[in-house]
Swiss-Prot record:
Alphabetized UniProt keyword annotations: Repeat
Top-level taxon of the source organism: Eukaryota
Protein's GO biological process: endocytosis; protein localization; retrograde transport, endosome to Golgi
Organism listed in the record: Danio rerio (Zebrafish)
InterPro entries for this protein: ARM-like (IPR011989), ARM-type_fold (IPR016024), Laa1/Sip1/HEATR5 (IPR040108), Laa1/Sip1/HEATR5-like_HEAT (IPR046837)
Extent of the signal sequence: none
Claim: Nucleus is one of the keywords in the record: no
Residue spans of biased composition, Basic and acidic residues class: 1162-1172
UniProt-annotated stretches for the region Disordered: 1149-1176, 1608-1630
Chain positions of HEAT repeats: 811-848, 1025-1062
Disulfide partners: none
Protein name: HEAT repeat-containing protein 5A
Amino acid sequence: MEQAHSLLLNEEACSQLPEHQRAEFVFEWLRFLKKLLPATDRADVKQKQKRLVEQLTTVLTSSPGPPTRLLLAQCLALVYRVGDSLTSSLTVDRCNDIIRSKDDSPSFLPTRLAAVACLGALYEQLGRLLINSFKETTTNLLKAMRSAESQGRCEIMLCVERILRGLGVSAVSCHRDIYKAARTGLTDRSMAVRCAAAKCLLELQREAVFLWSTELDNVATLCFRALEGSNYDVRVSISKLLGTLLASALEPRQAIAPRPGSKRSSLEEVMELLSSGFLRGGAGFLRASGDMLKGTSSVSRDVRVGITQTCVVFVSILGGVWLETHFSRLLSLLMEWASHTRATQYPADAVSCRCCVSFILRATLGTLLGEKAQIAAAKEICQVISKQKRVVDASLHEGNMETRVSPADVAASQHVLVCALLELGSLVQDLSSTAAPLLQDTGIGMLDTVISVLLHPSASARLASAWCLRCIAVGMPAQVAVLLDRCVERLNALKSCPEAVAGYSAAIAALLGAVQLSPLGISHSKGKMVMTLAEDLLRSAAQNSRISIQRTQGGWLLLGALSTLGPTVMEHHLPRLLLLWKCAFPLSVKDVEMELRRGDSFTWQVTLEGRAGALCAIKSLVVHCKELLTDDVICRFVPLLSCAVALLTQLPSIIKSYGNQIKNAATVFKLRLYEILKLLQPKIYEESFGTVLKQLLNDLTGPEITACAERNLLPSLCYSQDLALLGPGLQDMDQRYIEEQLHGGGSGGGTLEYDSFTIFEKSQEVLEQFCEFVRQLKGARQQTVQIHVTAAFFCTLKSLASSRRELGPEEVQRPALSLLLGALEGSNPLLRCMAAEGLARLVQVLIDPGFTVSLTLMSFDKLKTARDAITRTGHALALGTVYRYLGGISSPQYLSACVGVLFTLSQDNTSPEVQMWALHALSTVVDLAGPLYHSHLEASFTLVLRLLLSTPHTHVEVQQSLGRCLNALITSVGPDLQGEGPGVCAVRTSCLVGCAVMQDSQDCLVQALAISCLQQLHMFAPRFVNLSSLVPSLCINLCSSYLSLRRAVVACLRQLAQREAVEVSEHAVALVKELPRRDNTQLDVTIKEVGLEGALFSLLDRESDPRLCRDIQETLVHMMSSAAESKLAHWLKLCKDVLSASADSAAAASVETQQEEDGDRYDDSSAFHAKSESSGPFNNLRWSTRVFSMECVCRIIAQCENRDSAHFNMALAQEQRLHESTDFLVLHLADLIRMAFMASTDHSDQLRLAGLQTLLVIIRKFSNVPEPEFPGHVILEQYQANVGAALRPAFHVDAPPNVTAKACQVCSAWIASGVISDLRDLRRVHQLLASSLAKVQVGRDVPSQLYNESTFTMESLAVLKAWAEVYITAVQGSRQRDSPVSHQQQQSEEAGTAGQAGAGLLKLVQTDLATLSRLWLAALQDHALLTLPPHYSSHLPSTGGSFYTAETVEQARPHYYSAWATILHATALWLNSTGFIVVDEGPANLSRPVTPTSMGQSTSLSNVKSPEDINSDRLHLILGISVEFLCSPHSGDQMENIHSCLQALQALLEVPWPRSKVGNDQALSVELLSILHRLIVTRESPSIQLAVLELVQQIICAAQEHVREKRHSAEVDDGAAEKETVPEFGEGRDTGGLVPGRSLVFGALELCLCTLVRKLPQLSPKLTGSPTGRGGQTCSLSATDCRLVTSALAILSELPSICSPEGSVSVLPTVLYLLLGVLKEAVKGSVGTESGQLVSGILQALRTLLTSPMSRAEKSRGAWTQLLQCALHTLLESWSTDKVEPGVDEVTMLTSLTIFLLYASAEVTSVEPLQTRCIQTFRASLDSKDPVVLSRSYQLLLSLFQGPAPVARPFILALGGRLVSQLEEAEKSRPQGPAELQAVQDAIRALEALVFAADETHRPQLVAVLLPILISLLLDENALASAPAASRSLHESALRDLMRIGPQHSAVLKALMASAPHMKARLEAAVKGNQESVNSKAQAPPAISKNTPSIQLKINFL
């Protein structure tokens, strides 16, 4: 195929190819030529033009296929347009000659069609250059059309359309002739010709003014005739044509020359034209008159559907502005349609007409108008409703009761009211909370108007009114309670009026049904009210026969609707409901038989209505409250069902006895019974099987069943993909609502067949009876029965397959197969589809390979012998579906046979239907065969491509099947498409050629399949799909009028956006720039302005299909993920434009900050003001689209968080912006705040929630970003007023609870962020929370509860959580300010308002703390109760808790779960601040009891609790909640909750009283440790692990205090001084044993060991000994890891102190092993760079351990001494065996050794050889060459010399001389650096300590040694001047020491001076020099101080 890519056709390569590949080669060449010609130089084209034209002409005359001829025509026209156009007339003449040819043979037809196509393309491209031959060509074409077959007529019409497009106004001379030909084409028998003629006329009307002026009536009549018997495509084309003409007539695009008597059409005239077709159709005068006389309607439904679509097109073209202006008149005219007697003679016609009018209103108002215009339209509709209601009311009150209203008036008004009310409901539901102005407009009185219709005499109008109220309730949940109260009140007042009972009960039921769609619900009291009302209606039904039926129906309707509120409501009413059901049915089956002997037709009608209602209520309970269906309740059902089944068998005799007036009631009863039986388990009514089966057989096959709505019944039973065989009528489409009217048919039994039943032992008889019924009947009745019984059996098979049960023995299989095969060969295509699916289910149920094989062989035989299309289509589909549920095709033999048969059938050109079904079956086989199909791929691709290139465009159904087949083949090849082999390249080329053929198709479904195939190709081989051609084709179809095509386009875009979002967007913009201006749509303009993403936002706003909207949103998210950072400003502006594109939103403005000079008068509400902003790419977007834009903003912020840190750093962003052309989020903070404000203050509640969420995200992400220009400030400070203004509306009294709850969350985050710097700002925000707190105190017992009680829970807990967060922040801030570090910082910084705000926050909270603390405790108590296991549910308070009611337990749980942790932390902090001192604050700040028990503060005298009890309750409440949560096995718990729990426990244990309680209760302490141990194992978060260890330290501290107190008490009480022994306390007692699971010490050991081993696995003997373990590895520890290890060691060091002496001996070896093990790792340097922090912790732990009182206790002293000696030995051994690193490691070892020597008892260190080795270690350290080690050694010796005499003496004796000699050497080698200087100074101090450690008697001798050394370190005057800095420092230090020590020992000094004159001279010289230096400094003039300016300039201007 690569050889086809040239300017001229490679004829040699082409001739060598086989015949079937030649066409593909030519097509590929033409494809390439089409792309190449526009890019080729004109001269090159001219040079080769002659040869090129010859080649193209050769292709033209070689019978090209439809796709080839289309490409050929385009290429031929391009050649003349790009090259020389002079010879084009020759080609035109040649084409005309071909068209004139007399050759009528089928082989010449493709050439003639190609010539026609070429003419169209030539004239379209060259236009007026061919004007000379135009008339001749047109005449020739129109003449040929008369004798042409359907393909020719279609092609000629399309050719003429292109000619008109090319010539424009120049073609005016032939307009009339073309019009005449197109008129004929409009009513052609071929649907494709009708479509082509409509397109031709659509192009003609651009210049032919007469079409929409003088000829408008005739064209309209012609269009009406064209709609008769039309298909979907024709209706779309005709509606587009006629709608355009009517719009042109009303709003002409060009001026019409004035003619006598002519005038511009008015809206009334245009609608009258449509009305004539709508009411009379396309019939002539005589036929219409005859219909009028006969009283029948001749208007077919397809005409009405077509006119409906025309009306939508007409209004859409005129646009939203026109509609807004003229809606009142349009509405009036549409209502005339709905109420016209011609359209409403029969009920079915009336329903169809109403649907059409409703569709027009929905398709125009719902898509063209913005929210403000929709509100205006709703007001107009309200006026229409009021007008109609007034007419009916007037007729009701005139005259007597007999003549109160004519049926015609009621009928006319009811249809108008139904249409108006349904549209009003849809508008309000779409507008949601933005419809609030409608309710507030008292002039309209919308609610009064709608409710008034509930009294209408017509049931349809009443139900429409009820539905409208339901829509209002869904859109505005706040109205549910109000409307319910109002309807109940009116119903109680008008119980004697039948219409009122029926209307208001329907309204109440509708409102109850709306509650499940509202997240806020209604109060449970409303349920009780409705239950009482329903009981009252049912009990009073028999009191007045005139309204018995209405009360009965109303009562049961209310009970059925009540069940939709769910089990939490119904469980309270179930006993009463069961009693009502019992009363509705006889007590037994015998009573049913007795009933038959009494009553009349009226009583039976009431009885049947009542029982049908009861069954409906049972069904509603089963559907909505499955949890309540206990065995007991089901047992109560069984007698009722038995009676109902018994009555079922008696219905025929009852109807026979009392007439047909009760037939409807009997049918409804039967339906309700079948519905409930279908929902229940069959075992429940097992005794009634026989009766039910007989009745079902009769209902499915009975003689009264004459019609069947198979279009409603069968599609749901067919396989979804098989429905594609049945055309676009069963596909999803925009017009589905009215298109379904065409398939309604009769309703005889069509609603009963969905009831599946299970066949047991009577299966064989039932199936045989089914087959017999089908055999006996003929004609339409046979088909009806066949559909019913086959559908019933199919449902059985499906049920058996889903439950994995068997059908039965072979006797059952035979009739089953017979039944399905009969349906497979039926004339109804839907039935055949369902039968094929039924065979697949039968094979699945039987699981018999032999049966499957025999079934396929039978189909093969049938296909070989049968010649009729019906049989062949059915069995072809069966071949494809048989293996559908068996895991696919696994037999190569079956696959080969199947492929061979289907290949043959798919090439049967005589029957397009057989081709279509065979190809669809082949696609199914490809899917099911999987890799097994690979051997057939090449042949399949060849077949599909050949058929695609040869199938006429009129056979679109075959093209659709080919598309599905190609898609399956691409999927089968899969990732292999990426290969480079010759075979793969050929397959890939075939795929691309096939897709190109389908893309050029005129059919939208074929185009959609082409896009789907390209999407598959892109998934498997993305680099071979050319985006530059694919994306433009997608964008062109983005606004297609076909839903399936739009879905395919967006699905493909979604996939492309995941990989190449930027390229896709660029290609889209490039396409729009290249488009001719004539084709520009609003979408193109949008793409040009804001890119493809902006167009997708526009499309999202217009679309109503959920699947398509979801795909659009995902596409936008993918595009944003790829490009949001690189095009940040673009995306943010796009979101801002979308958000502000609302005509009526208060936020649709540019928002500017207004700051007043007077701070006291400053108010948040003035922070923003709106300025009109009309410009922008979007207009009137809906709230849902704007909500999505805010979600996009949040996504952008989240994306930036994971990218460059400069996004959240203003200084860094500004710096990088100077060097790079990058953008950062922080630079757009003003826009983010502005958008959040706009959304937060919108009318739409959903948008307000989205805005508040965005504001919350902004606060969390930007609160810590500093402001570079104002150090010490953050960037958000400048937006304080803006945030306050955004929050304020959410705290309004009328704000919904969910909005207020979200605002509380934002409020607390704002306060806690620390941004607020001014105390006044802080007070303003605090006041918002204070107002909410007051609302919480009022409580849930308010009389007008609008929402469910759980909303009070949500709001209350949100408020309490917000206050808790604020309090936590305030306390933490206060603690930080009180810390010493913070004090220093505050003193060093200037005092500012930030400090005032921080200090003021705690004061503000403390004013409400008394109230808050009680509320917090109450909320925690509620939470504790709700977390009890289910078997404790009986312990829950019957009235509920403080913030929830008993009925809303389940709804309340999530709200408690989201808030409890923060409240727990705050409560613990409050208790910490009070020190658990109970203060009686009094109830002054609390307006209601907080909780049933008030947490121990009840004022009842009998229940007064002591402060101790109250504290105990509070402590155990917090402990219990914390322990329960931390024990939870769920790993998904939020880390914040765990942190809050741990911090709460820490806050508690900081207070002595709770610490003593925990210390006293060892079981509790052990349990806590066990939980903390599991937590540290399961959570990897370092912060959690650190918090755990801190908490363990507090628990150990509590135990220490307890043990200390016990010991002290024992000593005092028992008189320890007088007794030899004192009882021992602590773990281990007398034995020293520690019991796992009961021992606190053991638990702490486990926890610490776990922590240490995880960080230092070398400590574990098992891991160290393991050859593959981590023992040998060295792991570097982070700073956090070091903190964890240090904390664990600190805990370990404290453990012996809580043991008895014996217990301490048990635990000491482990503690020492771990401590020394960590020390060893630290000394080895294996812990990394953070070892300094760890070493200090180790040494502190060692010191704590050595100073433990247990080391000196009498009972343990000996053991401790031995163990410590062993430890010291180990330490010394590691010194000698391990390679000690120089520097800090050696120092660490020396330090630890010193701690041992100083703090262990002398018994430990004085034994040999330990003492000697210690001395040797120090002696070795004194020989070190490292001055740091020397310095530290001297410091440690200083400590030792100052230590106890037994410790110091040996070291003084052993090392004193060494010390002196080293100091004497210092004179010779003076220090050269700071380290050496420090070592000498430390040595001097050590020697000084040695001197002063000596006895008084020996001290002078030692001073006599020290003083010469100091004097020797002095320098003379000359040496001092030139000496290094270290030497001078040593000189000065030595002199100071001499002047300090000398006077203390003057005698020694004098003796020394006398004996050593040279020393005396040196000393005197040094003193003299020092004195002179001091004097010179004192006489020096003071330096002039240079004041630093207070304001620093950033630029030095000097």
